[in-house]
Swiss-Prot record:
PANTHER family: MEMBRANE PROTEIN INSERTION EFFICIENCY FACTOR-RELATED. This is Putative membrane protein insertion efficiency factor. It comes from the Bacteria. It comes from Oceanobacillus iheyensis (strain DSM 14371 / CIP 107618 / JCM 11309 / KCTC 3954 / HTE831). Could be involved in insertion of integral membrane proteins into the membrane.
Length: 90
C-alpha cells in the first residue's frame, strides 16, 4: 500500500508540479515530507501526517521548517505534531 502512495507522490512531482507555481510554505516541501513520512511510518500513519501537513499549507499559515517527527506517539495529538514546526518570523 505504501508503494502506491509513494508512486502517487512521485507522479505528482513529475507530471503535475512542474506546471504549477512553487507555493509550498514549508521546508521540506509537502511532497518531500510526504515521501519521508510514508517511507518511515507506512501508508496509514505517514499518510495521516502528510494530510495534516498539506492541510496547513495555505496563505493563512506562516509556514517554516516542519520536519517529519522521529516518533509518532499519538497521531491525533496536535501538540505533538506542531512541536516540529519552526515558524518564519520575518
Amino acid at each position: 500500500m505504501k508503494f502506491i502512495f509513494i508512486g502517487l507522490i512521485k507522479f505528482y512531482r513529475s507530471a503535475i508540479s512542474p506546471f504549477t507555481p512553487s507555493s509550498c510554505r514549508f521546508y521540506p516541501t509537502c511532497s518531500e515530507y510526504g515521501l519521508e513520512a510514508i517511507k518511515r511510518f507506512g501508508a496509514f500513519k505517514g499518510g495521516i501526517l502528510t494530510i495534516k501537513r498539506i492541510s496547513k499549507c495555505h496563505p493563512f499559515h506562516p509556514g517554516g521548517v516542519d520536519v517529519v517527527p522521529d516518533k509518532v506517539k499519538n497521531i491525533n495529538n496536535e501538540k505533538h505534531l506542531e512541536k516540529g514546526v519552526i515558524r518564519n518570523e520575518d
